Amino acid sequence: FFACQSRVRDLGRREYSKHMLRLRREGHINGKEVPEIILLNSHDGSSSYQMIPGIFRFVCTNGLVCGNNFGEIRVPHKGDIVGQVIEGAYEVLGVFDKVTDNMEAMKEIHLNSDEQHLFGRAALMVRYEDENKTPVTPEQIITPRRREDKQNDLWTTWQRVQENMIKGGLSGRSASGKNTRTRAITGIDGDIRINKALWVIAEQFRKWKS
């Protein structure tokens, strides 16, 4: 359904760079939120095939990636690759119900303003590591970009944070005090890393609030 690839400085390696495919079942092309298989690969064999369950949210075009505890599959570039990829795809499909159940559970969990602030703070630590070097505040990260995202449940809070971090463009100040804007996360590895980390944070909140 969707494809992208990493940018490379050496144009001769453009056809061999890491790429990502987001795959959906035929009956899940449209919908408010649809489960996906995220396939990562590089044609030169420098990284193994990876298949990760995810969710695509149409209202903000957010592509979410589930954490490692939801059945990430890795297939090395050797042996019966096709057979292993097909088997791995079925394994990922098998966890879709669990992913959907957790999503629905998050929609039922209300977060007060302090809890939303804590979620935003944890997310910024994932991106910038040092709290003193974050160019924006947790309040900016949890601020909705559209009317549909003003709800205070865990699922929607997570969506706001994910979109603000991935798309960037937030006004802030650098460590030296200069005006700046947060950068969008455009690389495949960075996108996957942030998404996985946010899923883990959301899961921790779900368990804490349940």
Regions found by a protein language model. Give the residues of each.
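Intrinsically disordered, low-complexity regions enriched in serine/threonine
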Residues: 5-14, 20-210
